[in-house]
C-alpha cells in the first residue's frame, strides 16, 4: 500500500519549487478523495447492516425493554475489529526520523502520546455506547445535525480554524441536507412512542454528539501537536499516523466496552439474540463481522481526513454521505412510508452543494499556495 502524506508545513513549502509543490498537492488531493470514498463506503455499509440486524432481530416488534438492549454489544462491535489494521500498519513505509531529535523527545513525548490515546479511547467508548443508545431515542438527522454544530464550535476554539464564506455555506447546506434527508433506521421508535419533552432523550442527544465532536477536534490537535512533535515520523504527516491512532484508540475503547458488556450482564443475551435472528446464527455472526469491518473502514477514512484537512471537514464529508445512504436504505428495505421523495432529493442536492463549497475552499487555498511560491521564485530570480 502506498504511503499517503499530508500537506507540508508553510516553512517547508517555501523551500520547495513550484513543480514539487504541485506534485505534492496532486498526491494530497488523491489521498483526500480516497479517504472520502472510505467514509462513504463505511457509512453506507454500516447503515445497511444495522438496518438488516434490527429487522432480522425483530426488535421493533418486541417489548420496549428489549428494544433498548444490546447497546454495549453495538459499541464493542464499532471498535473491536482494529486488529485487521495491524498488518497494514507494518506494510506502510514511513520516513526515518533523526535519532538525535527522537532521543530528545522520548521521555516527555511517549507520555503525551499515551495520554492522548487513553483520553481518545475513553471518548470513543463513550460516544460508541451513547450513539448506539441515542439512535433508538431520537432521529438520526437530529443526532448528526447537533454533532456538526458542536464540531464547528470546537474547531473554532480548540483548533483555531479560520472560517471563510465557503466553509460557512458548506455547514449550512450540510445541516439542511442531513436534517431533512437522513436515512431511515429500523431501531428508531415511532413518533407516537416518543416524548419530545423527555429529559432522558435530550441528554442522550447531547452527550454522544459532544463526545464525538470533541474527539474529532482532539484527534486533529493530537496529529498537529503531539504525533508530529515527537518526530518519530520526521517532520511529516504520514498515513501511518492514522493507522497508529486508530489501532491504539480502538484498543482502549474495546477494553472499556468489553468491561461494560460484562458488568451490565448484557453478554448473557448474546445467545438469545442469535437464536431469535430470522436468518439464523450464521447470518447473525456474518452481520456482526460485517458491521465491525465496516466501522473500521469508516474510521480510517474519517481519521484520514482529520489528518489531511481538519476534523470539521471530516464531519462535513461524513454527514454529506447521509442522503446517499438514505437512497441505499430505501432501495434495500421497505420501511412503511419510507421513500426517496422530493425532500430527500433536495437533501441530496444540498449535500452535493455542501461538499462542492468546501472543496472549492480547499482548491482556492492550494491555488494560493502555488501562486505565492511562484511569486517568491520570480522575486528570487530578479534579485
Curated annotation (Swiss-Prot):
Signal peptide: none annotated. The keyword Transmembrane applies. It holds the Pfam family PUNUT. GO terms for cellular component: membrane. Keywords: Membrane, Transmembrane, Transmembrane helix, Transport. One of its GO terms (molecular function) is purine nucleoside transmembrane transporter activity. It is a multi-pass membrane protein. The keyword Cell cycle does not apply. It is found in: Membrane. Belongs to the purine permeases (TC 2.A.7.14) family. This is Probable purine permease 16. It comes from Arabidopsis thaliana. The gene is PUP16.
Amino acid at each position: 500500500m502506498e504511503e499517503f502524506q499530508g500537506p507540508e508545513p508553510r516553512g517547508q513549502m517555501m523551500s520547495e519549487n513550484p513543480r514539487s509543490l504541485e506534485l505534492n498537492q496532486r498526491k494530497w488531493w488523491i489521498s483526500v478523495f480516497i479517504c472520502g470514498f472510505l467514509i462513504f463506503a463505511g457509512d453506507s455499509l454500516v447503515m445497511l447492516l444495522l438496518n438488516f440486524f434490527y429487522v432480522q432481530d425483530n426488535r421493533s416488534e418486541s417489548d420496549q425493554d428489549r428494544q433498548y438492549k444490546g447497546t454495549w454489544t453495538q459499541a464493542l462491535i464499532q471498535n473491536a475489529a482494529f486488529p485487521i489494521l495491524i498488518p497494514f500498519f507494518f506494510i506502510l513505509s514511513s520516513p526515518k526520523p533523526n535519532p538525535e531529535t527522537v532521543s530528545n523527545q522520548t521521555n516527555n513525548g511517549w507520555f503525551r502520546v499515551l495520554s492522548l490515546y487513553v483520553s481518545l479511547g475513553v471518548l470513543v467508548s463513550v460516544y460508541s455506547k451513547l450513539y448506539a443508545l441515542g439512535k433508538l431515542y431520537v432521529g438520526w438527522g437530529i443526532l448528526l445535525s447537533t454533532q456538526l454544530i458542536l464540531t464547528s464550535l470546537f474547531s473554532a476554539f480548540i483548533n483555531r480554524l479560520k472560517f471563510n464564506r465557503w466553509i460557512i455555506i458548506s455547514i449550512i447546506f450540510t445541516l439542511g441536507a442531513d436534517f431533512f434527508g437522513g436515512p431511515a433506521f429500523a431501531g428508531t421508535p415511532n413518533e407516537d412512542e416518543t416524548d419530545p419533552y423527555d429529559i432522558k432523550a435530550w441528554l442522550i442527544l447531547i452527550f454522544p454528539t459532544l463526545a464525538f465532536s470533541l474527539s474529532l477536534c482532539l484527534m486533529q490537535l493530537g496529529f498537529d501537536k503531539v504525533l508530529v512533535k515527537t518526530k518519530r515520523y520526521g517532520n511529516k504527516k504520514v498515513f501511518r499516523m492514522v493507522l497508529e491512532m486508530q489501532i491504539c484508540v480502538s484498543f482502549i475503547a474495546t477494553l472499556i466496552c468489553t468491561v461494560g458488556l460484562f458488568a451490565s450482564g448484557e453478554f448473557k443475551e448474546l445467545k438469545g439474540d442469535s437464536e431469535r435472528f430470522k436468518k439464523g446464527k450464521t447470518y447473525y455472526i456474518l452481520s456482526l463481522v460485517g458491521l465491525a469491518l465496516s466501522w473500521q473502514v469508516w474510521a480510517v477514512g474519517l481519521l484520514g481526513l482529520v489528518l489531511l484537512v481538519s476534523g470539521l471537514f471530516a464531519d462535513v464529508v461524513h454527514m454529506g454521505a447521509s442522503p446517499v445512504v438514505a437512497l441505499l436504505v430505501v432501495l434495500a428495505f421497505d420501511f412503511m412510508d419510507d421513500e426517496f421523495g422530493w425532500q430527500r432529493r433536495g437533501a441530496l442536492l444540498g449535500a452535493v452543494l455542501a461538499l462542492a463549497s468546501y472543496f472549492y475552499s480547499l482548491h482556492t487555498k492550494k491555488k494560493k499556495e502555488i501562486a505565492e511560491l511562484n511569486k517568491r521564485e520570480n522575486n528570487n530570480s530578479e534579485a
